[in-house]
Amino acid sequence: HTLGFAHNFAASTNGRASVMDYPHPKLDVVAGAISYENAYAVGMGAWDKTSVRYSYSQFPEGTDETKELNSILEESILKGNRFISDQDARPIGGAHPHAHLWDNGASAIEEYNHLLKVRSIALKNFSDDQLRVGEPYSVLNDRLVPMYFLHRYQAEAIVKLIGGVDYSYGVKGPIPFEITTVAAETQKDALTAMVNSLSSEVLAIPKPLLKQLPPTAFGYSATRESFRSQTGRVFDVLGAPASLGKGIMQMILNPERVSRLIQQKALDANQLSFDQLANELTKSIFKKQYRDSYHQAIQAQLKESYLNVLFGLHANNNTTASVKAISFGVIKRIENGLKKNTLEPHRAYYINKIKRFLENPEAYEVQKTPVLPDGSPIGTDTFCNQFTF
């Protein structure tokens, strides 16, 4: 910023092209173990060098400066560098498939699946080895947070493929300009990856680890970056999966995102539709069955959160009539399915919950559930181009 450079949140699609892209640590899996060897890069990236050349190059007298500056940009574009900044990268409802904070990789889908693998290894290996001698066991609670939510920022990246639109800050010149919708197969693959990450197997904290997560020790306190709890001072075993699951659902069912899906489907019959998206979520959350009681309890939390997110989407005053109509249909299909499913243990509760909501959507108060701990701390109303997040 001191040199006058803005964030380039599309730089990470071309390696580590800019330190102004908040690159996430690169974590590799080698022989079944997590490797930190390439976690951080050293020095400037390709886009940073382009920024310096464009801003501070001095040309001999008589040089066509405009031509030389344009050639710097054209050369950078041909090398695969892109520039997309704050206003297109920060909003959860953003559409740009390449502009994200704290992400890695040319493929958001591949990196999301990779981070889930890294996370699985980290959770299996997480133990009191993460403590110094003399530290309270309760410190593990906070040290678990970044491991459990390891993929939260990559989730913000992959979800922008759904209803995604690729564009640039193009100007008229020799470089072709075109706005394109993210391919239907890519959108469907992104949805599949996100739905898979909502399974109870992925959301469950390993049972052996739960035995090492006591209430906060005397002299210590929970912070805004700690797990939230609805079980008093005792670690909320179901609260962590509930908050993560709800957070991912809110990303997927963002009002702006589903509005774009409806428009994209209208222009291209092969595109992913809002109906298809909702059907995949419903199938995963309401139709998947578990024998394990721990997984059943997590699934019940997901059902509650899914209904609440759908209710919020339908009642949102800023959504279009099409969003309201389709979300209404989704809710009714869930209700009808519940009426037929006599094996659902909370059947009467869910049916009554839906009935009360549909009677008066605007007046319905959604039940509170634990929210995600605060994550990215960077940015205020004053800095980063006046965008809040």
Language-model features, listed with the residues they occupy:
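Active-site recognition of the HExxH zinc-binding catalytic motif
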Residues: H1-H7
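Short, flexible loop/turn elements at secondary-structure junctions
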Residues: H7-F9, H24
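Conserved catalytic/binding loops enriched for acidic/polar residues
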Residues: N14-F389
